Regions:
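Hot-dog-fold acyl-thioester-processing enzymes
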Residues: 2-70, 117, 122-198, 246-247
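Acidic/His-leaning functional-site neighborhoods
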Residues: 161, 165-241
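HotDog/MaoC-like acyl-thioester-processing domains
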Residues: 2-7, 18, 72-157, 207-213, ...
Length: 247
C-alpha cells in the first residue's frame, strides 16, 4: 500500500528505478526577457513539451488528453539565461484516482537549476475527466514507488482593492478542446511576475475558454484570472531573486 495522499507541494527525488525520460532544449530568443533571463512562461512551455514527449514515447494508445491542474517549480541553482542548453528529466511521482503527478528536473550542463511538480488530469476529447488506464501503472508505476497524491488544490480569493484589468484572449491561446492552453495561461503570469523567482505555483480551478471575458487581478505576490466573478486560475510567487551568481 502507498502512503496517504499529500496536499502540500513536495519535490521528490529522481527515482533509482522505473521510467525516466529526458529531453534536450534551449532557452531561445522568443522565451527570454530583456534581462536575458528565461521567462516563466518559457519554463512552463518546456515542462509541457517534456510531458508531451514522454507521453507520446511511452507507447500507451488512447484518445485521452492531459490537462494541467497545478504546476509548481522552484529555483535550486542559477536561473537559466538565453542560449543556455537545457536537459529536462521527467518521471511520474504519484497518482490518485483520476490524476497523476509529474516531476521534472531542469539541468544546465550537469547542474540542477529548477525542480518542478505538476498535477495532471486525463480527459476525453470533449474535456470530461477519465480514469487512469491500467497500462499507465504498468509503464510508470515502478518510478512512483507506491506514492499517492491528492487532487485537492487550495483556493484563495482576491482581496478588496486588488488591481483589475481586462485580459483579452487570442485564438492562438486555444488548445484542441477549446481551452486556453496551459502555457498561454503562463503568459499572464509572466506579464505580472518577472523571472527569476525563488518559486512559483499556478493552480487551474476551472477552464478559461474561447469567448470568456477574463479579468487579470493582482495583489502583492498573487494574481488571479477571473471569469464572471469566478476565479479560474491562481498564481503566486515567493520572492524575486535579487542576487544571482550568473549575473
Amino acid at each position: 500500500m502507498g502512503a496517504e495522499p499529500t496536499a502540500e507541494r513536495e519535490y521528490v527525488a529522481e527515482p533509482d528505478v522505473g521510467r525516466l525520460f529526458s529531453l534536450d532544449s534551449l532557452v531561445r530568443l522568443s522565451d527570454a526577457l530583456p534581462s536575458s533571463y528565461w521567462r516563466l512562461d518559457g519554463v512552463a512551455r518546456a515542462l509541457q513539451d517534456a510531458a508531451t514527449e514522454d507521453w507520446e514515447d511511452c507507447g500507451i494508445v488512447t484518445d485521452a488528453l492531459w490537462l494541467a491542474r497545478r504546476t509548481s517549480f522552484r529555483r535550486v541553482g542559477p536561473w537559466p539565461v538565453i542560449y543556455d542548453r537545457l536537459r529536462l528529466t521527467t518521471f511520474c511521482a504519484g497518482v490518485g484516482a483520476a490524476w497523476a503527478e509529474r516531476r521534472t528536473n531542469i539541468y544546465v550542463g550537469d547542474q540542477l537549476v529548477i525542480e518542478a511538480a505538476s498535477l495532471w488530469v486525463p480527459v476525453d476529447p470533449r474535456g470530461f475527466p477519465v480514469r487512469i488506464p491500467a497500462t499507465f501503472h504498468e509503464i510508470f508505476g515502478e518510478a512512483m514507488k507506491g506514492r499517492r497524491v491528492s487532487g485537492r488544490v487550495p483556493v484563495t480569493l482576491p482581496p478588496d482593492g486588488a488591481a483589475r484589468r481586462p485580459w483579452p484572449l487570442r485564438r492562438a491561446d486555444l488548445d484542441v478542446i477549446g481551452h486556453v492552453n496551459n502555457a498561454a495561461v503562463w503568459q499572464a503570469v509572466a506579464e505580472v511576475f518577472d523571472a527569476p523567482v525563488e518559486s512559483v505555483d499556478v493552480i487551474h480551478h476551472g477552464p478559461v475558454e474561447e469567448g470568456h471575458e477574463v479579468e487579470l487581478v493582482t495583489s502583492g505576490d498573487t494574481m488571479w484570472l477571473v471569469v464572471d466573478g469566478e476565479v479560474r486560475v491562481t498564481a503566486s510567487i515567493v520572492g524575486d531573486v535579487v542576487h544571482d551568481a550568473r549575473r
